[in-house]
Curated annotation (Swiss-Prot):
This is Small ribosomal subunit protein uS5. The lineage of its organism: Bacteria, Thermotogati, Thermotogota, Thermotogae, Thermotogales. GO terms for molecular function: rRNA binding; structural constituent of ribosome. InterPro entries: Ribosomal_Su5_D2-typ_SF (IPR020568), Ribosomal_uS5 (IPR000851), Ribosomal_uS5_bac-type (IPR005712), Ribosomal_uS5_C (IPR005324), Ribosomal_uS5_N (IPR013810), Ribosomal_uS5_N_CS (IPR018192), Ribsml_uS5_D2-typ_fold_subgr (IPR014721). It comes from Pseudothermotoga lettingae (strain ATCC BAA-301 / DSM 14385 / NBRC 107922 / TMO). One of its GO terms (biological process) is translation. Part of the 30S ribosomal subunit. Contacts proteins S4 and S8.
Length: 178
């Protein structure tokens, strides 16, 4: 049993993930003796093939905070369905007061997004997407809202079955008959 768990862990670690630090923020705790400084780091990891994770690390030293953030991001990796170079359908992600709208885009559009949302969708492997951030623009909440939206994605076949339409109608919209 332990051998299987070790093999699974090695397999997960050996999988090549690209890492990106989105934000490094210095925080101060004011005490009677003065200010205690620490750092908070937001990191995103992904393999550009449909797997992405977001993590936050806090420590008194920047390198330690970065290490913790990357470890947290690797632990939170989720798999998302991609359709060619975009997402299969429109989706809305929420985290606290932050909201992110993600819409599929035609090839050649690129990633139309702010820096935090861009980091998450780029490392997920999406190449063409339109996004809009609504509400709070706090980096951590935006990254988590984007991840929540990506988690809500379903494959075109599954979406079509749920809505009782064809997969083509999910991807290209329902055609009106004259």
């Amino acid at each position: 049993m332990d051998e299987i768990l070790e093999e699974e862990l090695e397999k997960k670690e050996s999988e090549e993930f690209e890492e990106r630090i989105v934000e490094i923020r210095r925080t101060a705790k004011v005490t009677k003796g003065g200010k205690t400084l620490s750092f908070r780091v937001l990191a995103v990891v992904g393999n550009r093939k449909g797997k992405v994770g977001v993590g936050v690390g806090k420590a008194r030293e920047v390198p330690e905070a970065i290490r913790k953030a990357i470890a947290a991001a690797r632990a939170s990796v989720v798999e998302i369905p991609l359709y060619k170079t975009t997402i299969p359908h429109e989706v809305f992600g929420r985290q606290d007061a932050s909201k992110v709208l993600l819409r599929p885009a035609a090839p050649g559009t690129g990633i139309i997004a702010g820096s935090t949302v861009r980091a998450v969708v780029e490392l997920a492997g999406v190449q063409n997407v339109l996004t809009k951030c609504l509400g709070s623009t706090a980096s951590v909440n935006l990254a988590l809202a984007t991840l929540n939206g990506l988690k809500d994605l379903v494959s075109p076949e599954k979406a079509a079955k749920l809505r009782d339409i064809t997969p083509a109608q999910v991807l290209y919209g329902a055609r009106k008959e004259a």
